[in-house]
Structure formats: structure tokens, C-alpha cells
Amino acid sequence: MKMNINKACDLKSISVFPPNLRRSAEPQASQQLRSQQSQQSFSQGPSSSQRGCGGFSQMTQSSIDELLINDQRFSSQERDLSLKKVSSCLPPINHKREDSQLVASRSSSGLSRRWSSASIGESKSQISEELEQRFGMMETSLSRFGMMLDSIQSDIMQANRGTKEVFLETERIQQKLTLQDTSLQQLRKEQADSKASLDGGVKFILEEFSKDPNQEKLQKILQMLTTIPEQVETALQKIQREICHTFTREIQVLASLRTPEPRVRVPTAPQVKAKENLPEQRGQAAKVLTSLKMPEPRVQVPAAPQAKENFPEQRGPVAKSNSFCNTTLKTKQPQFPRNPNDASARAVKPYLSPKIQVGCWKTVKPEKSNFKKRATRKPVKSESTRTQFEQCSVVIDSDEEDIDGGFSCLINENTRGTNFEWDAEKETERILRTARRTKRKFGNPIIIN
């Protein structure tokens, strides 16, 4: 806090002592020293006032002591001056004697002779002047002392105000601190309550879990869940084994079906309907296919004896692969209208054209001599009037059912003048459809992680 000190106590604004011509140089020096000391005391006054009332009391006591000392000095100096004046008024003594003799002579001589009326009047006037000067000095010192007291009082008042303000601020700070202490205590209490509630809740939950009768069931369920992955692994291994066994069996069956059988041409029966061409009359391979719901994908018609050497079964495996993959249709097949909603298109018509004679297969193995004789007995017909037969093989490797308006089958022609009749083409369509369906069913890969 800043304390404004009254400037009236400045010594420069105070009037100077009246001039004293008769005063010697020593009292002037003493006055200067006294003024300097008073200025120092006033300059030190604010700092001492800031420190406290103890400093003010010390300063006042020191100033009073200095004033008393100065008064004593002035009184002693004035006495000396008065004695000197009195001695100057007396006649000079020319005789040089010791001090004891002078004192004895002074005491012995009468004072009445030496004092005159004029000297007494002058001494009175001088004494009165000196007294007036002393009274004036006392007044000035008292006035200065009063001004010092006034300045000290103002400083004390300011210090009291500052202390009051500080006290008020400290009281406010104490109130704030008390509020903060109360809030902290409330927070601590709330924390303790929350901890106690949480501990109680946790204990209650643990007790409920411990008292739960379904704990054994939960343990059993956990054990079952832990055993589930092992069971799944064992089941997957079993399924893999079964799938491998089934695939191997099916592959073996397909390989056995694809192996060629010995085929012998048999004389055809006249005017046989398509219903008589049952799977029981087609051989053992057809029976296996019907039992597995996988019809034979080959359509074979008995060929003339001249084309016997062109059979793919007699050429070996290389000729078979070439006949299946490398040859394509040389003649355009007739396009048949296909209606999926029409049931007559799916079934084979029971009637045949009267000009065609279709025979059925029989498991008869005649001797070679008889076959040669029969071949020689038959006359050779011209190309225009001979019976038209064909040895063809159909490939079912592709899934596309419509290429250029027909089926994606490959036919290996071995004779001239081949011609498909209406009922034979429909039968091949039906066989191809069933074969592709079965292939799609069994051909989809099964991925097991």
C-alpha cells in the first residue's frame, strides 16, 4: 500500500529563524546540524510509518532528545556570551598574574565600584533580547514539533486505514477458504458414500451369484461349449471321409461305364416301335445307369457291315479321344422347336415313320464264320437306295445347351449320306438333358475348411 505523507512537514516551507548578528559562528553551525537532522527525520518518516507505530514512537523520542540537547547547548553558549560581555565592560588588567590571584582579586574587590548604571541598563537590555530570542526559538521548535506530530498523526491514520483494508481482505480470504474447506469435506463424504455403495453392490452381486442354483447348469453349459469345437472337427473329418468314399465310388462306376463292350451287329426286326427300346433290352451298362439315375450319354445305332472297321472301340484310346474332341459336325442338324411348357417335347413320341426299321440290342455272340457268310449273302446296294446308318458319339463336357440353334455335341461321321430322323433326334435331346442335369448335380465342388 502507498502512503501519502503530508508535505507541510517539509522544512523548506518553514520560516527560518530571525537573524542574530551578535550570534557567533558556532550556534549557526549547530542550527544547520539541527535542521539537517530534522530533514533526515522527516525523510525517514514515511518509511518508518510504513513499518509501524513502533518506528513513529522511536522517531519522536529521538527528535525530543535532540531538541533538549540543543536547548542545553544554546543556554550554555548564551551564558558564556553574557560573561564575556560583562568582562568586556570591565577595565582591562595589565598585570599578569596567575588565575588564583585574579580570582582572589576579583572576589576581594567590590562589585559596586565596577558596576555602573549604564552597564546595568545595557546588560538588562541584552538579557531581555536574549530571552526574546530564546522564546522565539522555543516557539519555532514547538511549532515544528506540532507539525511533526500532525504529520505523524496523518501517517498513523493512513496506516490504520491500510491495516483495516488488509484485515477486511484477510477476512474475505478466510471466508473463501472456509467455503472451500466445506466443499472439500462434502466431496470427501460423497466419495466415501459412493465407495461404500459400490462395495455393497459388488458384495450383493457376488452373494447372489454364489447363491444362484443354476450355477451348476452354467458350468455344464460351459463344458459343453468347450467340447463343441472338438465335436465339430470330428464330424467334419467323418464328412470328408464319406465324401471321399462316395467320390471314389462314383469315379469307379463312371470309369467302368466308359469302358467299351464287345458289340456285334444283329439282324434288325421289322417295324419295331420306340416303346420296345427299354433299358432292360440295352445291356448291363444301361441297367447300371438307370439305377444311378445317370443315363448313358452315348447314342449308338447299328451300322452297316462295311463300316465295321471305323468303330471307335476298335481304334484304341487315342482314336476315342480324337473322335470325342477334335471332330465337329460337318452337316447342319435340323433345328427343333423347344417349348419348356410343352410336355410332348420332353417325351419321346411312340410312333415312327413307316420307312425306317429300328432294331433292338441283344446279347448274342455269333461266330466269325457266320458273320462273314451273312455279310457275303447281302447284296451291295447303290448309294441312293441303301439303308442309312451311322456310328456317332456324343460329348457332354460343355454346359451350354444352345450353340447355333442346336446342341453342343460333337459327332464323328464314318459313312456317307448320314441322316437323322425325327424321333432319334428327340431321344438324343432327352438323353443329353438328363446327363447334363446329373453332371451339374454331382459336379459342383464341395469346399470344406
From Swiss-Prot:
<dbReference type="GO" id="GO:0009553">
    <property type="term" value="P:embryo sac development"/>
</dbReference>
<feature type="region of interest" description="Disordered">
    <location>
        <begin position="21"/>
        <end position="56"/>
    </location>
</feature>
<feature type="short sequence motif" description="Nuclear localization signal">
    <location>
        <begin position="437"/>
        <end position="441"/>
    </location>
</feature>
<comment type="subunit">
    <text>Interacts with PRD1; this interaction facilitates a binding to DFO.</text>
</comment>
<keyword id="KW-0539">Nucleus</keyword>
<protein>
    <recommendedName>
        <fullName>Putative recombination initiation defects 3</fullName>
    </recommendedName>
</protein>
<dbReference type="GO" id="GO:0070192">
    <property type="term" value="P:chromosome organization involved in meiotic cell cycle"/>
</dbReference>
<dbReference type="GO" id="GO:0009556">
    <property type="term" value="P:microsporogenesis"/>
</dbReference>
<comment type="function">
    <text>Involved in DNA cleavage that forms the double-strand breaks (DSB) that initiate meiotic recombination.</text>
</comment>
<feature type="compositionally biased region" description="Low complexity">
    <location>
        <begin position="28"/>
        <end position="50"/>
    </location>
</feature>
<dbReference type="GO" id="GO:0005634">
    <property type="term" value="C:nucleus"/>
</dbReference>
<dbReference type="GO" id="GO:0042138">
    <property type="term" value="P:meiotic DNA double-strand break formation"/>
</dbReference>
<keyword id="KW-0469">Meiosis</keyword>
<dbReference type="InterPro" id="IPR034546">
    <property type="entry name" value="PAIR1"/>
</dbReference>
